[in-house]
């Protein structure tokens, strides 16, 4: 990751400008779903992930409350990511058919999944 991307990532993760969104993500991180009750939620803004020189940019609408807000990575740990990663793997764009948490070993070829501040 380049220094510019690292600076942008740090800026995004530390952002608290939209108080409504801060309250919402903090509430979700505190009032967990029963199935994730023993997991620690990320509860901060999430950043993009992937190859900064990618030819394919896949942009989602918003981080999932119990997916990205829980795992700390866009399109990770929820039902939409289960489907997405199977497709990416089948298309040879991902090295594995699933992504369950921020520090798993998933990587992309020619693909990045940004959040809107990157776009």
Where do the language-model regions lie?
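A polyanion-binding, active-site-adjacent surface
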Residues: 2-113, 117
